[in-house]
């Protein structure tokens, strides 16, 4: 009778914990949460299984999970990831331990898609390797769009999944499940990187062995930091002339300010690149087979790299000592850490965002990709090790920690939308609970209930149907109408998750279909592209009667115009690209404006007093009311704010948005019958225009952080091109056979630069542009823009 009695006591203890969790002091709660691990240990013992059975085990695990969920609500900061992992159901713990959600990100042409193609081949996901640009009429698996294969660039992030078999330290093979997203490298498609990193647990940052850290590498680093994504680094293209992996390591340390150290050294370089030396185990690794399918290990390290291997191993330990306490103690005691201690330290420091281990290889030459995959398993976190927070709308958006238990209420984030032959495809990351086919889920943004008709795992443009997806996984769902960034729950929780960062567009152009019969397809395409891409905006200019599209650059908009032609068979006419200028106030100006129209019928009366001034930085506009004594009622002040916001949408100078302007209303007057919300809104707009004109306002133009790379023999020509565009050159780096120029350029002066650069460098130069900041436009340009706008307004009034 002892076992049943023990079982009853354990069950009562667990349920007692659940009922009383919200009333317990946090220290005691954590102790009790931890205590459920012992109950689960008993649950898998044979004697316990025979008495309770499978149902009781699930009930106990569910109770433990509920207690942790309650702790996640009450005090998310006090609930550690360790406590969450300790209370996982054993089956779930094993599943999550073998799962990695990773992305591959880098500067354009660093070899991301080529590397992903090898990963898919070595994991058995594809049967043959195909190259970027579709040279063999097939193209890389992850570049599924024809445009991607033709241009040799990734335009959309692509998701896939695969299994990687890795031997543990006892030599036993362990299978790991990878959810993998390949991202674009071009700055125009940066939103694809943003939304991928928003939902991933780790990343592989790829660098070119020749160029090292480049402009988009810095952008990717900033995005990884924004979402707290740990990364390992892979120095690719070791077979290229001028390859110098240690320059890349130094640049990660110095340019990215991220502690980094090589965990491998190359055996040879350029056309003599043979393999790598594993600095942790001090073994030489070579790829063998027609496509490098097998890794051959040798205990003997080639003499030519022995010295540098010893030196770099010492540097690895020294760098780890700076970021990990355990290694620091060993280092100070002048002891040598073991292999396991080094691996554990790298893992702790990498997951803690303090360090990145650097691997080396050549994806195109099929060398050293598999050791990088081992690094993904060894050093990047599983879903249970990553802290994810949501906002509880029922408790004034208080932060709550999400717990990756399948038995808990479902919470997921829609991070990407895509049109397919079967309708809208919504990519979802499941953070908590289970998403099941046929289940009802609720959109936290609009509280709409939708049914999940079909769940698939994506493999680029192919898909495999599944019945359910557990916590920590990524999937795609058909038949759900939503927007990118929407949170879905099972309806019992009022949770919503913060969305990804969406940069503002910098380039616009007018567009219309060449034939009026294509209007329906044109509208359908515009609606779809906006839904899929938050950086692609569509607006209608009533004054010019034109549809305006806005995006991150010329290439961004060109791609959508071409997609419209290919996917919807709509040929379009486009205007010249237009720069997204801004306007800003000059000096502080006080105003006292009276709007008075009283002519027998219902009149208008509103008096507003106050001042306008710069905010001190070119940032968001601010409206404040400092009215004392109730001279203007709350509803009229709300109308004043509305009038201010409308005025900022279209400035008086050239009709562009206003930045960095603050309006304060501190007094005014109303009329008993003639004052209305409309009159105060109009009065505020009139006061805004008058005060803005008196403040010596300015037109602002966007400056672009521009990086140009070309062979050294064209350096003079490239500098000349930039000088013609009044660029401010900030830095120049000269390498063995190429140079890089960093400059700030006016976006207005960069239209057509791509063609000029190709002509000046015989097609060998490349450049990237990224929005930097707004700055006052030159006086002559301001006069031209204002005169052009005034003339256009006058011409419209004549009509």
UniProtKB/Swiss-Prot annotation:
Any Pfam family hit: GTP_EFTU
Gene Ontology biological process terms, A to Z: mitochondrial translational elongation
A single GO molecular function term of this UniProt record: GTP binding
Residue range covered by the transit peptide: 1-33
SMART domains for this protein: EFG_C (SM00838), EFG_IV (SM00889)
Main subcellular localisation: mitochondrion
Highest taxon of the lineage: Eukaryota
Binding annotation for GTP: 106-113, 182-186, 236-239
Limits of the tr-type G domain: 97-384
Location(s) in or outside the cell: Mitochondrion
GO cellular component: mitochondrion
Keywords assigned: Elongation factor, GTP-binding, Mitochondrion, Nucleotide-binding, Protein biosynthesis, Transit peptide
Classification via PANTHER family: ELONGATION FACTOR G, MITOCHONDRIAL
Family affiliation: Belongs to the TRAFAC class translation factor GTPase superfamily. Classic translation factor GTPase family. EF-G/EF-2 subfamily.
Name by which UniProt lists this protein: Elongation factor G, mitochondrial
Organism in which the protein naturally occurs: Penicillium rubens (strain ATCC 28089 / DSM 1075 / NRRL 1951 / Wisconsin 54-1255)
